[in-house]
């Protein structure tokens, strides 16, 4: 043994290192911190908007940023659920998906219609999807305003599209959004609405879109207050 690696061994080492780098560099630690802060501020604004729609105290916790894929979502999340796609038309190029549990959508819809949040029998229909789309339009619209201030440019969204998803094991091509077929960024929040909702909501992002949002906001990491829960009442 002369201690000299063969070309095959060198190639194998390089390939292994490339694979590790690909996994590790989905987001850097600073990007994870930045998107967490962006989500924290944006969802705080959204909580205030939701309070005005349902007339109940709304609490949304500080976010937890992680990486996920379709198989993990299928295994971990309640079925069926509602996916709301939010696309950006100005200032950012991309989209994200907000995931809500079916029961939570029914409660929010009933409250928006002037009910007490208990009329949740039956399957989700067009009324529910229309109502939650409008709620998300207002919530994410207010979040876009906050994001505009952070990024110092105008951010606009397209009308959200809501769809019931049964979380099958197989993701059909073109279903919801193509980025779900690969590893994506998951941002989880705990949400409470009065004494009616005590649940988890998720935002799903393609990594490239997260990186775009994180540009120019690193200063927030040094000037923002400590993590906190947002409550609207």
Report the location of each language-model feature.
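Generic N-terminal amphipathic, Lys/Arg-enriched alpha-helix
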Residues: 19-31
């Amino acid at each position: 043994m002369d201690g000299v690696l063969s070309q095959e061994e060198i190639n194998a080492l390089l390939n292994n290192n490339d694979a590790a780098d690909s996994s590790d560099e989905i987001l850097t630690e600073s990007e994870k911190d930045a998107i967490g802060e962006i989500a924290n501020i944006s969802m705080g604004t959204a909580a205030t908007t939701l309070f005005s729609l349902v007339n109940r105290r709304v609490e949304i916790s500080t976010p937890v940023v992680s990486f996920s894929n379709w198989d993990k979502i299928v295994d971990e999340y309640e079925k069926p659920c509602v996916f709301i796609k939010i696309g950006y038309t100005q200032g950012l190029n991309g989209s994200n998906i907000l995931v809500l549990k079916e029961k939570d959508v029914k409660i929010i819809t009933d409250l928006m219609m002037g009910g007490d949040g208990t009329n949740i029998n039956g399957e989700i229909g067009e009324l529910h999807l229309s109502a939650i789309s409008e709620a998300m339009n207002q919530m994410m619209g207010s979040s876009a305003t906050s994001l505009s201030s952070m990024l110092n440019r105008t951010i606009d969204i397209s009308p959200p599209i809501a769809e019931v998803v049964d979380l099958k094991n197989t993701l059909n091509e073109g279903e919801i959004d193509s980025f779900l077929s690969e590893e994506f960024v998951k941002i989880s929040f705990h949400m409470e609405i009065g004494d009616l909702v005590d649940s988890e909501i998720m935002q799903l992002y393609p990594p490239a879109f997260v990186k775009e949002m994180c540009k120019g906001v690193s200063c927030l990491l040094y000037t923002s207050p400590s993590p906190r829960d947002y409550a609207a009442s």
